[in-house]
Amino acid sequence: MKATNYLVAALLASPTLISPISAHAEGFFETRLDGVRTGFITRSWNDRNYDGYNTEITAANCLNNPHGSPGRVEFTLKKKIPVLPDHDLGTRTLNGCYREWDRGNWGRVAAGDYYAVVGTFDWNRLTINWLKVVY
């Protein structure tokens, strides 16, 4: 058998080698939030909507100050609009990050500049040891 026949046989036997690569997010960033209060604004990002990927925020290892107080972690996704008030795309609650991790998903959003606003109890200082924004 010729070398090219071996190559063709190997490729046919392994469809994962020739299947299209799954879609990946256009961009992401990871950060840590330390002692933030309600109303804290994350860094912004530009979603060009080239890939059609959902916008998601994942939070892990959340802590409160004062320690042991009840937890609440919310993120409100906002789209920057010049001159007008920014567009609110809804709020997701991620309280699972106190146990392990949790994720909020806003689905596919239109191209534009975005940021998220943190929501927690007014008296709380929230720490999120690992935060990932995917867009």
Regions inferred by a protein language model and the residue ranges of each:
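C-terminal segment of classical bacterial N-terminal signal peptides
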Residues: 15-22
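Bacterial N-terminal signal peptides that target proteins for export
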Residues: 1-8
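Intrinsically disordered, low-complexity repeat segments enriched in small/polar residues
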Residues: 8, 19, 94-96
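Post-signal peptide N-terminal regions of Sec-secreted extracellular proteins
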Residues: 24-135
